[in-house]
Structure formats: structure tokens, C-alpha cells
Amino acid sequence: MHEMSFAEAIIRNVLRFAEEKQAKTVTSVRVRVGELLLINPEQLQFCFSVASKGTIAEGAKLEISVERADIRCLLCGRELSKDEMLCECGGFAQVKGGKDFILESVVVEV
């Protein structure tokens, strides 16, 4: 379950930010996850709650938005699905989006 390593990374960064702001509590965290990372949002929610236990982020709301993959044929420009790496025209796919994992915002109480 690679969701736990992502949850731990979120918590590390959130706690670093909260410490810089001298926060007492973290109330919410928002992340954007690329669909090509194959992260299950429900599992990430669970792992976040486990990883945040005993920290000032315990009980914080985790908002997850999934970024759709942007995959296009290099020859004809047709949009392809994440399961297509070769277009009907014979062109190969170029992946431009859906691979990122971004911590978008952290809300804290000082």
C-alpha cells in the first residue's frame, strides 16, 4: 500500500509548515493527486488519519482532488485514455498530466 508513504510525506510537510507558522492545530489539508499515480483516495484518507495520530494534524480534514491524465497522440493530437499508449493512427502517446502529487493548501489555527 503505497498510500501510506504518500500520507507520511503529507504529514511531514504539513507539520513543517505548521511549525514555521507556530500553529496549535492543523484543521484541513488539500492535495491534488494525478490519476496515473494509482492512489486510492479512500486508502489515502485512512493512511492520513493513521499517520497524523498524536500530532497537531490529528483530526484534520484531508481534501483530495484527482487530476485527470492528459495523454495525446504525437501524430494526430487525438486525446487518448490512460490505457492507450498507441493511437489508432499508429502514433505514440505523450503524457502531459496526471503524474503529479501536489500539496495545495494547509489551514492551521495559531
From Swiss-Prot:
Family annotation (InterPro entries): Hydgase_Ni_incorp_HypA/HybF_CS, HypA/HybF
HAMAP family: HypA_HybF
PROSITE patterns from the UniProt entry: HYPA
Gene: hypA
Chain's role: Involved in the maturation of [NiFe] hydrogenases. Required for nickel insertion into the metal center of the hydrogenase.
Binding site for Ni(2+): 2
Protein name as it appears in the record: Hydrogenase maturation factor HypA
Gene Ontology MF annotations: nickel cation binding; zinc ion binding
